[in-house]
C-alpha cells in the first residue's frame, strides 16, 4: 500500500466528486464507503479559501483486504492525518475504486474546520510526509501488504500522476525498450541506457543522481525518466540482480527495527499535530472570538485569498456575517438563520423541520437521545447550535399592534398592552424560527439529524425568548416616563390657559346702575 496526495484542490466541489463517482454517479467499480458526496461538494463550493479541498488515495497492490480491514485502515488514517480532531470537526468522503484490478481507497476532505469555520489544512508535505510515511510502513507491516519501499518492489519507471497521456505513453514505451535490451544483455549500466536513448533518436537534456530527462519529440516540457534503470546506482548490469537480492535480505532482517522507528516517528508527529490542531481549533476560544464580532482565522495564513472563518459553525449559527464576496450557499444559510428583514409571517422552508423537532422533543422528553446510538458524529452543544448570543444583535420589531396616535382616546394601558403584545409576538416568532432552522442547517452541514440537537435548539430558543423578555423592561419603563411627562405637560398647559383667560373675564365685567332708587 502506498499513500498519495494529489496536487489538485483549487477548483469547485464537482470536480473531485464527479471524478470519483462519475457525473451521473454511475462510475463502474466506484462505491461510496463513507460520507455524503453532495454535502462534500457543497462544502467545498462554500469554502472561501484558495485551496478548497485535500484529496488523495490509499493504493493497494492487493484486490481486497481482510474482513473489516478497510474500515480499520480508513479510521486509522483519519486519526493520523488529523489527530486531535473529532468526527464532527471535519467532513470526509471515502470512495472505493476496483476498476483497475486492485483496491483503491480515495478520499476528499473540504479544507474547513466545521466548528470554527477556520481554514483546515490536513496535509502539508514538508511537515506531514514523515508521519504519513511512518504510518504507511506500520500498516504494510501489520497486514503483510505489498511494500513499495522493498528493494524487490522498486519500479523500473516512476511517473507523476499529472503527466499527460501522450508523455506517459512515450515514457512507458522507452522503459519497455530499455528493459528488453537489459534482459538481452546489451545494457550493463547507466551509460548504456543513455547511449540507447540517443541511438533511438531521443535527446538527453539532463542527467541527475536519480533520473534522466529527455526532450519531448512533440514539443513541450521535457519528460523525466525516473526508476531503477535511470538511477546513478545502476552501474553494473551484471550485478543488479545480486545487489537487489542482497538489499532485499537486509531489508527483511531490519524489519523489526524499521517498524519501531516508524512507530516512534508516527507517535511524535501525531503529538505535535494534535497540539497544533487543538490550539488552533479550540471551540471555546473560537466561539468567544465569534461573539466578539471578529472573524475566526482571518488573515492567519498569507496564501488565503478569501476571508477566513465566514462560512460555517460558530459564525453561521447566528453571528453577523456580511460581504458580497460570500458564496450563495453560505448566504442562504446565513439568511435562513438570522434574518435582518421584518418577519412577514409567510410559511418558510423550515416550518416543517420545526414541527418535526417539536414532536421529537415531546417524544424524547427526559431521555438522553444520543445514548444508544453509534457516536460517529457527536451531538453538538446548545451553544454550537444556537451560536451563543445570536439574538444580541437582532432588532426586535415593536410596530405590530401598537397604536401610533397619542390622543386622549387611546389610553395608556391599551398602548402598553399593545406594545408588549407586539414585542412578545416578535420574540416568539424568533424562537419558532430558531427551533425550525437550527437543526435543519446543522443537519445540512454534517448529515446528522439527532433528536438531542433538536432539544438543544429548543432550549436555546427558550433562552432567546428570556433575553427578548428582558428587553421589554426598559421599553415599558421608558413608556411610563414618557406618559407621565406628557400628563404633566398637559396639566401645565391647561393651567396656563386658565390663567390667560382670567384677565379677559375681568375686563368684560361692567358696573351697572344701582337698583336702590
Swiss-Prot record:
Binding site for a divalent metal cation: 97, 104, 106
Outcome of swapping residue 19 to A: Loss of in vitro DNA-cleavage activity and in vivo functionality
One of the record's GO molecular function terms: DNA topoisomerase type I (single strand cut, ATP-independent) activity
Enzyme class: isomerase
Top-level taxonomic group: Bacteria
Note accompanying the cofactor annotation: Divalent metal cation. Can use Mg(2+), Co(2+) or Ni(2+) with similar efficiencies, but is not active in the presence of Mn(2+).
Region spans: Disordered: 281-310, 380-405, 496-517
Listed EC numbers: 5.6.2.1
Effect after changing residue 106 to H: Loss of the in vitro DNA-cleavage and strand-transfer activities but displays 1% of the in vivo wild-type activity
Catalytic reactions on record: ATP-independent breakage of single-stranded DNA, followed by passage and rejoining
Effect of residue 106 to A: 4-fold and 3-fold reduction in the in vitro DNA-cleavage and strand-transfer activities, respectively, but no reduction in the in vivo functionality
Cofactor(s) named in the record: Mn(2+); Co(2+); Ni(2+)
Catalytic residues identified in the record: 19
Family label: To E.coli MbaA and MbkA.
Additional remark text: The 100 C-terminal amino acids are dispensable for activity.
NCBIfam families the UniProt entry points to: relax_MbeA_E1
Summary of the function given for this chain in its UniProt record: Relaxase involved in plasmid ColE1 conjugative mobilization and is thus essential to promote the specific transfer of the plasmid during conjugation. First catalyzes the specific cleavage of one of the DNA strands at oriT, forming a covalent 5'-phosphotyrosine intermediate. The nic site corresponds to 5'-(1469)CTGG/CTTA(1462)-3' in the cleaved strand. The cleaved strand is then transferred through the dedicated type IV secretion apparatus.
Subunit structure: Interacts with MbeB and MbeC to form the relaxosome.
Protein name: DNA relaxase MbeA
Amino acid at each position: 500500500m502506498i499513500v498519495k496526495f494529489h496536487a489538485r484542490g483549487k477548483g469547485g466541489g464537482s470536480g473531485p466528486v464527479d471524478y470519483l463517482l462519475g457525473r451521473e454517479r454511475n462510475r463502474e467499480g466506484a462505491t461510496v464507503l463513507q460520507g455524503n458526496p453532495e454535502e462534500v461538494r457543497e462544502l467545498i463550493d462554500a469554502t472561501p479559501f484558495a485551496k478548497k479541498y485535500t484529496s488523495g488515495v490509499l493504493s493497494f497492490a492487493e484486490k481486497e483486504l481482510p474482513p473489516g480491514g478497510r474500515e480499520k485502515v480508513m479510521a486509522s488514517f483519519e486519526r493520523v492525518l488529523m489527530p486531535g480532531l473529532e468526527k464532527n470537526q471535519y467532513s470526509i468522503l471515502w470512495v472505493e475504486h476496483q476498476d483497475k484490478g486492485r483496491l483503491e481507497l480515495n478520499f476528499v476532505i473540504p479544507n474547513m474546520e466545521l466548528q470554527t469555520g477556520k481554514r483546515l489544512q490536513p496535509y502539508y508535505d514538508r511537515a506531514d510526509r514523515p508521519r504519513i510515511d511512518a504510518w504507511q510502513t506500520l500498516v504494510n507491516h501489520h497486514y503483510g501488504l505489498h511494500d513499495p519501499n522493498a528493494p524487490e518492489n522498486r519500479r523500473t519507471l516512476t511517473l507523476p500522476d499529472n503527466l499527460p497521456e501522450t508523455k506517459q505513453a512515450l515514457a512507458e514505451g522507452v522503459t519497455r525498450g530499455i528493459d528488453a535490451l537489459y534482459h538481452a544483455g546489451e545494457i550493463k549500466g547507466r551509460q548504456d541506457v543513455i547511449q540507447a536513448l540517443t541511438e533511438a533518436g531521443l535527446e538527453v537534456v539532463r542527467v541527475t543522481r536519480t533520473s534522466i530527462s529527455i526532450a519531448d519529440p512533440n514539443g513541450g516540457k521535457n519528460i523525466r525518466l525516473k526508476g531503477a534503470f535511470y538511477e546513478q546506482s545502476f552501474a553494473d548490469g551484471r550485478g543488479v540482480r545480486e545487489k537487489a537480492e542482497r538489499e532485499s535480505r537486509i531489508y527483511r532482517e531490519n524489519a523489526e527495527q524499521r517498524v519501531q522507528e516508524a512507530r516512534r516517528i508516527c507517535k511524535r508527529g501525531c503529538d505535535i499535530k494534535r497540539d497544533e490542531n487543538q490550539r488552533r481549533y479550540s471551540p471555546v476560544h473560537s466561539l468567544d472570538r465569534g461573539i466578539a464580532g471578529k472573524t475566526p482565522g482571518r488573515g492567519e495564513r498569507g496564501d488565503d485569498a478569501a476571508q477566513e472563518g465566514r462560512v460555517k459553525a460558530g459564525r453561521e449559527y447566528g453571528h453577523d456575517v456580511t460581504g458580497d464576496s460570500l458564496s450563495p450557499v453560505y448566504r442562504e444559510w446565513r439568511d435562513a438563520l438570522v434574518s435582518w428583514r421584518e418577519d412577514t409571517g409567510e410559511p418558510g422552508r423550515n416550518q416543517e423541520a420545526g414541527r418535526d423537532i417539536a414532536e421529537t422533543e415531546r417524544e424524547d422528553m427526559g431521555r438522553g437521545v444520543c445514548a444508544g446510538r453509534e457516536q460517529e458524529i457527536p451531538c453538538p452543544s446548545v451553544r454550537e447550535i444556537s451560536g451563543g448570543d445570536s439574538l444580541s444583535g437582532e432588532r426586535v420589531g415593536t410596530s405590530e399592534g401598537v397604536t401610533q396616535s397619542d390622543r386622549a382616546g387611546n389610553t395608556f394601558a391599551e398602548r402598553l398592552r399593545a406594545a408588549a403584545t407586539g414585542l412578545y409576538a416578535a420574540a416568539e416568532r424568533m424562537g419558532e424560527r430558531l427551533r425550525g432552522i437550527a437543526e435543519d442547517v446543522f443537519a445540512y452541514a454534517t448529515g446528522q439529524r439527532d433528536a438531542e440537537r433538536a432539544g438543544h435548539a429548543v432550549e436555546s430558543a427558550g433562552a432567546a425568548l428570556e433575553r427578548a423578555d428582558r428587553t421589554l423592561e426598559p421599553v415599558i419603563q421608558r413608556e411610563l416616563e414618557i406618559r407621565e411627562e406628557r400628563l404633566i405637560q398637559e396639566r401645565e398647559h391647561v393651567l396656563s390657559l386658565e390663567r390667560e383667560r382670567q384677565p379677559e373675564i375681568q375686563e368684560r365685567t361692567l358696573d351697572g346702575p344701582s337698583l336702590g332708587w
